[in-house]
Amino acid sequence: MKFELCAASLEAIRLAKELNFDRIELCQNLEQGGITPSNGMIEYAIAYGIDTHVLIRPRPGGFNYSEDEVEVMLRDILNCKEIGAKGIVIGVLTESGEIDREILMEFMEKAKGIEVTFHRAFDDCFDWKKSMDILIECKVNRILSSGLARNVEIGMPILHEMIEYSCGRIEIMTGGGVNAANIGRLHKELEPDAIHFSGTVKFQQDEDSLFSESVLRIDKARVQRILAASKV
């Protein structure tokens, strides 16, 4: 089983390397669910020597995108491939909550040669079995999911069904609310291909500044506790 850190800061990138994570999902603005990071941040992570999978998401909110947004996403995918990212993390749905196969295939064509993860947009899908079949047909490498629920604990029954249904045809990575209290159970009962978590805490950035913001900051001790609990 592999471990993926959701890294939204330079500190998180360095910690992932220090603690020997298998890979990172690189993003920015984790407080809004994450958006595509800057070129400088992507290049920093790659140069730091960790497998970097870049989130391709032009804005917060849902996953039904306009033509202009799709154009930006295609440019971002090509850019990530050209500068050496190991993979990309994407998700695109129709207005009715189905995977947009046509746009997904455009993304897959641009991403040819690197890995592709379909993120938790999957948890917004109307029919998860049909959606998984589409992703398998489109040769997506893995799905990140909380089992169609707010968090992995609530979604464990569906995650179990997903892993059985996938039958090794696509990787299933669990994520969403993973912590030291539940990771051991996830590992033991589900045996997913990978577990994804951020290990962050709320923090008031630059609290004496006029521009102070509440952010999610990586917490080394919390990350270490989660990793340790996975081995129990």
State where each predicted segment sits.
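N-terminal pre-domain/capping segments
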Residues: 1-24, 29-36
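Active-site-adjacent beta->alpha loops and helix N-cap segments on the catalytic face
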Residues: 11, 30-50, 68-71, 93-112, ...
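Catalytic cores of alpha/beta
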Residues: 11-15, 64-77, 123-138, 162-164, ...
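Glycine-enriched alpha-helix->loop->beta-strand junction motifs that scaffold or abut catalytic
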Residues: 19-24, 48-51, 83-87, 110-114, ...
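Glycine-rich phosphate-binding active-site loops on the catalytic face of alpha/beta enzymes
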Residues: 25-35, 79, 83-95, 140-153, ...
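Glycine-rich nucleotide/cofactor/substrate-binding loop typically near the N-terminus or early
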Residues: 56-59, 63
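C-terminal alpha-helical cap/extension of soluble enzyme domains
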Residues: 60, 84, 167-232
